[in-house]
Curated annotation (Swiss-Prot):
Alphabetical UniProt keywords: Cell cycle, Cell division, Cytoplasm, Exonuclease, Hydrolase, Magnesium, Manganese, Metal-binding, Mitosis, Nuclease, RNA-binding, Tumor suppressor
Record-stated family: Belongs to the RNR ribonuclease family. DIS3L2 subfamily.
The gene coding this protein: dis3l2
GO CC annotations on file: cytoplasm; P-body
Cross-referenced InterPro entries: Dis3_CSD2, DIS3L2, Dis3l2-like_C, NA-bd_OB-fold, RNase_II/R, RNase_II/R_CS, RNR_Ribonuclease, Rrp44_CSD1
Spans through the membrane: none
Lineage, opening ranks: Eukaryota, Metazoa, Chordata, Craniata, Vertebrata
PANTHER family in alphabetical order: DIS3-LIKE EXONUCLEASE 2, RIBONUCLEASE
Assigned EC number: 3.1.13.-
Binding site for Mg(2+): D354, D363
Protein name: DIS3-like exonuclease 2
Length: 834
């Protein structure tokens, strides 16, 4: 949907939630300019309203493809509050923490199952970033969008919400001047008050912005104002963000290139960064300033920089005051007094296992057999807190960045590269400072003893996951020197090989026990790219294989994180920084349970463990079953909430500490301090608890604030990583396409269906009106959605070919690059061509 609806509602039907009297006033141009938005409440009014329970606060989530729809978590945790329109959103941007006021019940959204097909329940939505309505339907529905009956949707999903509204458009709202009116009824339904509460979704309007979480930066394009003779056009240009959730922005003409006013067409494909500086209550448009020109749209580096700026990722060079916090005498060596304070493990067989390209090696493993048949297993983590003094300029900047950001082509580090890749990185045959957790453990994974402390190690080899996997796959093979990177002469290859095998044995038992105890893992397909060394363009991509060597490392990292969580919580019950994972969202989970029942799928959602077991027991190992499992795993991931950091003193109910997916009472992050600031705080807590570090200066309120910030940056980092992969895949399709693949249907609407492209793991929507069809027909078979396609025959006189599309149908698709930069289309091959 284009931003034209946001800018010129009169041209494309008035938006729901837009007051027509405002529009009429703007058209007339007479008299004083009226306010488009309500004035915000005062801080005092907001504080009093929150205390009385009259107002609700929470993070705002705006639908990426229907920018006039926004959502706020409901206090009851069931169905999100619905903010219907740009005006009720009141200038808040995606991610902002806002305060809302509920609208009267007659303005709530009516939800009804049997009116039209729902695009956000399982089987009807994939959560991918595609329009639910086919393009020609979107045009027709935009003409009169005021009064609709919506299918019963689950508004908690991040990306869906687009309902197929065939035959659902009704007469206009009689009371056109009522702001935010969303009365949805038909003559058959009668008075909305006769419905039960389940038939409604509460609606609200924003009355205050508590915290502007959004960066207020946007990537987009500049263009002249349409009325070039106006005074405004001589002073301003119009900035159109790529992200339609943002308003269009007036920018000073002086910020634009010097020849823009004369030759605007020269910059039609140039990406710019704009910063929003103000948004008055009497304007549909925000005000801002151009920050810089990025380059041509569709090129990797300009697009990447745009993503980073939009999501507030600091990719600037570290300033001198930060670099001054690092050791200045290089090459740096460990001070002699540190050896006296630490356990010396330099003679132990310790090694790293990481991706082949990794340079920030923050964890190492050891496994020594004991005479009694048990093992001494160690997890050794880079001692970042030794170099990052609390309160230093380095500490402050690291806390602000909070996480390293991993793009396809590079890493934006949390810490200066001198630390990430040298002083803290556990590089082979180099003495390094570490924090260790060492267990005495049985082959079955039973822990007999546990030790925490600061240490010094010297890794004997840098193994990749491929190296470790080769050792696991060939337990009896003699690994030759040329098959590995350089190995320390202190340890034999056979010794390392045996240690990997022993770790693998213990890890298998630990993993089995974890899942027997009720853990859940939902693996989704992840794309990896190979890049051309000269151009940096993607020359290949494949789905990453998660193998036994990955699982080996994961099990011991989990074990260390859980052990440290219990330790610091015992010592600091009010100040411990832990990580919790709330259970799935109730409404979405109930929808998924209903869908599985309709599809005859025997899944048990009663706990994380039963879900994991039933999901894995449901399918065989053939390719079709694997594809079905992938579709179902994707559906199961949608109700899941994000895991979050928190300070134990901020939550009084200890049951809320629980980690749903791991099914453990306490968990934290300890094992990646080079790339996560939360781990640095945990290291400080651990050091303080052991008496080998200074007391922590941060009170629990500050720890909670830092935890919230880490959560925000983690979310942003995850999204940036996804967008980077999407960017590279779009370029890959352009450079190497068209690409053919098998795909499986994972959602069916009445004019479109969603597929997961099995070769690449991407999700796309295919519209019926883009196919050479005689016609298409949607129906419910029982409660299962089904779309029948009648293809135009290839030769005259032949009968149309019939194809039935339903959940789990296998189809053949072709991915083709569009003319628009970074866009590609999935085209369904006709049954005759398959």
């Amino acid at each position: 949907m284009h931003n034209s609806e946001f800018l010129s509602p009169v041209q494309s039907g008035t938006q729901r939630g837009t007051n027509r009297s405002i529009l009429n006033n703007k058209k007339s141009g007479k008299g004083k300019k009226k306010s488009v938005f309500e004035a915000y409440m005062t801080k005092e009014e907001v504080s009093a309203g929150l205390k009385r329970g009259e107002l609700i606060q929470g993070p705002l989530r705006i639908n990426p493809k229907k920018f006039h729809e926004a959502y706020l978590p409901s206090p009851d945790g069931v169905r999100d509050l619905f903010i219907d329109g740009v005006v009720p959103r009141n200038r808040a941007l995606n991610g902002d923490v806002v305060v809302v006021k509920l609208l009267p019940q007659e303005q709530w959204k009516v939800l009804k199952n049997d009116v039209c097909e729902d695009d956000d329940t399982p089987g009807h939505s994939t959560g991918n970033k595609q329009h639910a309505l086919s393009p020609h339907l979107m045009k027709s529905s935009a003409k009169n969008p005021d009064l609709i009956i919506e299918a019963k949707v689950d508004s908690s999903a991040e990306d869906g919400h687009e309902s197929a509204l065939i035959g659902c458009l009704q007469k206009e709202i009689k009371d056109q001047d009522k702001l935010g009116a969303i009365e949805e009824k038909t003559s058959k339904q009668g008075d909305p008050k006769t419905f039960s509460d389940d038939c409604f979704q509460k609606t609200a309007k924003v009355v205050y912005i508590l915290e502007k979480k959004h960066s207020r930066a946007a990537t987009g394009f500049i263009k002249p104002l349409s009325d070039k003779s106006s005074d405004l056009a001589r002073k301003r240009a119009l900035f159109s963000p790529v992200d339609h959730r943002l308003p269009r922005i007036y920018v000073p003409l002086g910020d634009c290139p010097h020849d823009f006013a004369i030759h605007p067409e020269t910059y039609a494909n140039t990406l710019f960064i704009c910063s929003i500086t103000a948004w008055r209550d009497d304007s549909n448009f925000a005000e801002g300033k151009l920050m810089k020109s990025l380059g041509q749209a569709g090129e990797i580096e300009p697009e990447t920089e745009g993503i980073l700026v939009e999501y507030g990722v600091d990719f600037s060079d570290f300033p001198d005051k930060v670099l001054q916090c690092l050791p200045q005498d290089l090459p740096w060596t460990i001070p002699q007094e540190e050896f006296q304070k630490r356990k010396d493990l330099r003679n132990e067989c310790i090694f790293t296992i990481d991706p082949a390209t990794a340079r920030d090696l923050d964890d190492a493993l050891s496994c020594k057999p004991l005479p009694d048949g048990n093992f001494e297993v160690g997890v050794h983590i880079a001692d970042v807190s030794y170099f990052v003094a609390e309160g230093s300029a380095l500490d402050i900047m690291a806390s602000e960045r909070a996480t390293s950001v991993y793009l396809v082509q590079k890493v934006i580090p949390m810490l200066p590269r001198l630390l990430c890749e040298e002083l803290c990185s556990l590089n082979p045959m180099t003495d390094r400072l570490t924090f260790s957790v060492i267990w005495k453990i049985t082959p079955q994974g039973e822990i007999l003893d546990e030790w925490f402390g600061r240490s010094v190690i010297c890794s004997c080899v840098k193994l990749s996951y491929d190296h470790a996997q080769n050792m696991i796959n060939h337990p009896d093979k003699k690994i030759e020197q040329h098959e590995l990177p350089p190995v320390s002469p202190q340890h034999t290859i056979n010794e390392i090989h045996q240690a990997v095998l022993n770790l693998h044995l213990i890890a298998q038992n630990l993993r089995k026990q974890r899942f027997d105890d009720g853990a859940l893992r939902l693996d989704q397909l992840k794309l990896t790219f190979t890049l051309d060394k000269e151009s940096g363009l993607p020359q290949g991509c494949y789905i990453y294989q998660y193998r036994d060597s990955n699982k080996l490392v994961e099990e011991f990292m989990l074990l260390a994180n859980m052990a440290v969580a219990h330790h610091i919580y015992r010592r600091f019950p009010e100040e411990a920084l832990l990580r919790r994972h709330p259970p799935p969202q109730t409404k979405m989970l109930n929808d998924l349970i209903e869908f599985c029942d309709q599809m005859g799928l025997q899944l048990d959602f009663s706990s994380s463990g039963t879900l994991h077991k039933s999901l894995n027991d449901q399918f065989e190992t053939d390719e079709y079953s694997a594809a079905r499992k992938e579709v179902l795993t994707n559906m199961c991931s949608r109700p899941m909430q994000m895991a979050v950091y928190f300070c134990t003193g901020a939550l009084k109910d200890e049951t809320l500490f629980h980690h749903y997916a791991l099914n453990v009472p306490l968990y934290t992050h300890f094992t990646s301090p080079i790339r996560r600031f939360a781990d640095v705080i945990v290291h400080r807590l651990l050091a303080a608890s052991l008496g080998c570090g200074p007391p922590l200066k941060m009170p629990k309120e500050v720890i909670q604030k830092q935890a919230d910030h880490c959560n925000d940056r983690k979310t942003a980092s995850k999204r940036v990583q996804e967008l980077s992969a999407e960017l590279f895949f779009s370029v890959f399709v352009k450079e190497c396409g068209p690409l053919e693949s098998e795909a499986m249907v994972m959602g069916v609407l009445n004019e479109a269906f969603d597929v997961i492209v099995l070769r690449f793991g991407v999700q796309k929507r295919i519209y019926c009106n883009s196919l050479p069809l005689v016609n298409s027909h949607f129906q419910q078979v029982g409660k299962r959605p089904e779309l029948t396609l009648l293809w135009e025959p290839e030769k005259k006189g032949e009968e149309p070919v019939r194809q039935v599309i339903s959940i789990f149908t296998l189809v053949e698709v072709v991915l083709k690059s569009d003319n628009v930069p970074l866009k590609y289309t999935a085209v369904l091959k006709s049954p005759e061509a398959q």
